[in-house]
Curated annotation (Swiss-Prot):
The gene is NP. HAMAP family: INFV_NCAP. Homomultimerizes to form the nucleocapsid. May bind host exportin-1/XPO1. Binds to viral genomic RNA. Protein-RNA contacts are mediated by a combination of electrostatic interactions between positively charged residues and the phosphate backbone and planar interactions between aromatic side chains and bases. One of its GO terms (cellular component) is host cell. Residues 79-91 have a biased composition (Basic and acidic residues). This is Nucleoprotein. The lineage of its organism: Viruses, Riboviria, Orthornavirae, Negarnaviricota, Polyploviricotina.
Amino acid sequence: MASQGTKRSYEQMETGGERQNATEIRASVGRMVGGIGRFYIQMCTELKLSDYEGRLIQNSITIERMVLSAFDERRNKYLEEHPSAGKDPKKTGGPIYRRRDGKWMRELTLYDKEEIRRIWRQANNGEDATAGLTHLMIWHSNLNDATYQRTRALVRTGMDPRMCSLMQGSTLPRRSGAAGAAVKGVGTIVMELIRMIKRGINDRNFWRGENGRRTRIAYERMCNILKGKFQTAAQRAIMDQVRESRNPGNAEIEDLIFLARSALILRGSVAHKSCLPACVYGLAVASGYDFEREGYSLVGIDPFRLLQNSQVFSLIRPNENPAHKSQLVWMACHSAAFEDLRVSSFIRGTRVVPRGQLSTRGVQIASNENMETMDSSTLELRSRYWAIRTRSGGNTNQQRASAGQISVQPTFSVQRNLPFERATIMAAFTGNTEGRTSDMRTEIIRMMESARPEDVSFQGRGVFELSDEKATNPIVPSFDMSNEGSYFFGDNAEEYDN
């Protein structure tokens, strides 16, 4: 965590390592994705999948979910203790799609969790390789971020649907560790904290006893993670207040919602990583690529390069647009659900449209959907340029207090202007500046009011040609000033339901 004074790169968090130099980081991240690839190849063999079936993203997701479920200690324990009808706690499985006589068939597969764990460990030199599991969780989370809207969840916790750009990682499981915490948006953590405080208000024993002590530690840890995402002293000071509160209640909820709103202009630092489906790593390993020897980074050219050379397929429903399905998966692969569409379009080399205009539903197929009419098509996941992923909120003034980009949480470190309507945002801050955090609130509002829309974020940063792996010649794009592109405008996506 940033506040503990140990700044580790997110590759280190992802691979659970202590401080390492760049080469060691690249090697350990390479070992992690190589392990995922080896596991995937072995699973395809077990399931007797053809080459084409193994490249189907829906099969990849089923296999990924099986291994995540096999290692979900908490849920496994819960299932053992609360046996439910028709669920074998020792087994895991899902839909596998096969091509038969020119048609796609769905087949439900079941495996012993023990067997899956054995295959996973074997692919990872006998280790549990938690980092690889977290990597898969982040890929699923990025896919959810691009596919679903969280309006209902926002409204339930008293937040505003306009804060959707703060919700990165909102579907990540609790057990996703430091790497998971790094990619969570400000709104996601605020929401977790508010849920906690609400439970404490409704349940007298929530903070009491031995369990309550553990709860309290978790609460303070989450507060520290959130504090570490804020870049201004006033925002951090309010987080200290929230963390030290003896008996967190409505005042703290108020403070947290205020902070979430302020993060629309004073953006927090949220990490972005390109996590790809397991089948992509599998394809590379199968073609003889040695990830550990070559090294790999989640935030540089490597994922772009991997996607340039991978052919992945997807099932397509009758009235879906394959190009739109490709856009959805491309955004998920680069963790770009919250990026400015102008920037994404430039990097991808084809226009990226807002979600409200996509003719495609989610990637996963529900068990009651008719397979008769299913077709499949190639996903176009290639890009025109590549760019470095960022973990800053894109605040302009030396990355400190200033205008970040509204309704956007930047993914790529690429210069852009900040077209935003400050009046709209400031309207959310009328009135309430009293209470014990009043001076900090006033300070935050003052900073937000002085934010200038003509400022530029990531000054001088550009994209790179795919041949420029050392990032020597940045190409700084120029964007149309007037329209900022949020992916969520005119949103009609489905809600995320567990």
